[in-house]
Amino acid sequence: MANVENTWWAEKYRPKTIEEYVGNNEISEYFKHCIEKNELNHLLLYNAKSGTGKTSAAKILANSLDADVMYINASDENSVEIVRDRIKTFASSNSFKTWKIIILDEFSYFTMNAQSALNSMMEQFSKSTRFILTCNEIWRIPEAIKS
């Protein structure tokens, strides 16, 4: 029961705007720039520690831009089928917004096949779709995706 209450509390008080986000000033300033210009590159947010605000930062940025947003928790959904079905369908769909943003939380849980498939999709849909990846274990991410 305590775990459910902690989850509820964390979601209730999760920052929703860049002004509410407290933590890394460098990230906050970069995000403010992205929001002002409505520009975004693919991002990899990582820190060895859990609970440092990676997911909150990703959601704040994505929801502050003119974008359709898809969120996937890769610790639950991490197969190549997720990439080929859900992600490709979303990335290839039409949108009236400037961007489509796909947040892949806990990306290091993606299988190697899923990471390889995603890498080619990041290139294929780079004109309209941006990927924000969060992870704790940067060493599990292939160099091709890090670059």
What are these regions (language model features)?
Residues M1-S147:
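P-loop/Walker A NTP-binding region and its immediately flanking N-terminal helices
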